[in-house]
């Protein structure tokens, strides 16, 4: 195993273990040796997806609350906020992608694994409500380990609240596009990740419910090598397309053109 750190000037690739200089990862954060894709921060994802200067955050005041009195939860939250510069695991706003307007929500797995809680739920609800109010397509980029255990049933209720709001969105002509990135697991994959009119999986993404290790500890089965991969889901008809990271922006832009909602609603 490499002695190189997980971050810094030189970094060990999590997949192949080779030593990669930060410049070698490139704009799209891909290992030059094994082509492993690094997980992106929200800032990196926005930089790659939206037209320069077009992203305008929605006004959101929701903050996480320790309703269950879970030990050390608030300390973990503050630590995640310091490390990421975010106040929660999703950022939502209006944006242009290839000059096409949309409402965009981007989850960040660096913030407590992008887990779904009451604050993230309210932000996603607000994003969908704004899509309906402004008559814009909604794009959700998922990157999550599932529901946040520190908020227990309150986090699980969020799954149904989001599904109910997306049902209201589905009753309009407005499209929902979901982009499943690594990881998309647990309660997020079990709820809204697969509700898109168009479901795109980023190449190399791990997508599923329970992890492979948990499944193998529970059931005496040998899982296939491509288990819970974007390619496997595409092969089985669970996603509409698998797209390499450098092509995501143009793919989304073309999809928005094809739907023709944003420009027709906004001139």
UniProtKB/Swiss-Prot annotation:
One of its GO terms (molecular function) is acetyl-CoA carboxylase activity. Pathway: Lipid metabolism; malonyl-CoA biosynthesis; malonyl-CoA from acetyl-CoA: step 1/1. Its main location: cytoplasm. Residues 9-267 form the CoA carboxyltransferase N-terminal domain. It is an enzyme of class 2 (transferase). Its cofactor is Zn(2+). The keyword Nucleotide-binding applies. It catalyses: N(6)-carboxybiotinyl-L-lysyl-[protein] + acetyl-CoA = N(6)-biotinyl-L-lysyl-[protein] + malonyl-CoA. InterPro entries: AcCoA_carboxyl_beta, Acetyl_CoA_COase_Trfase_b_su, ClpP/crotonase-like_dom_sf, COA_CT_N. Zn(2+) binds at residues 13, 16, 31, 34. The keyword rRNA processing does not apply. GO terms for cellular component: acetyl-CoA carboxylase complex. PROSITE patterns: COA_CT_NTER. Component of the acetyl coenzyme A carboxylase (ACC) complex. Biotin carboxylase (BC) catalyzes the carboxylation of biotin on its carrier protein (BCCP) and then the CO(2) group is transferred by the transcarboxylase to acetyl-CoA to form malonyl-CoA. Acetyl-CoA carboxylase is a heterohexamer composed of biotin carboxyl carrier protein (AccB), biotin carboxylase (AccC) and two subunits each of ACCase subunit alpha (AccA) and ACCase subunit beta (AccD). This is Acetyl-coenzyme A carboxylase carboxyl transferase subunit beta 1. The gene is accD1.
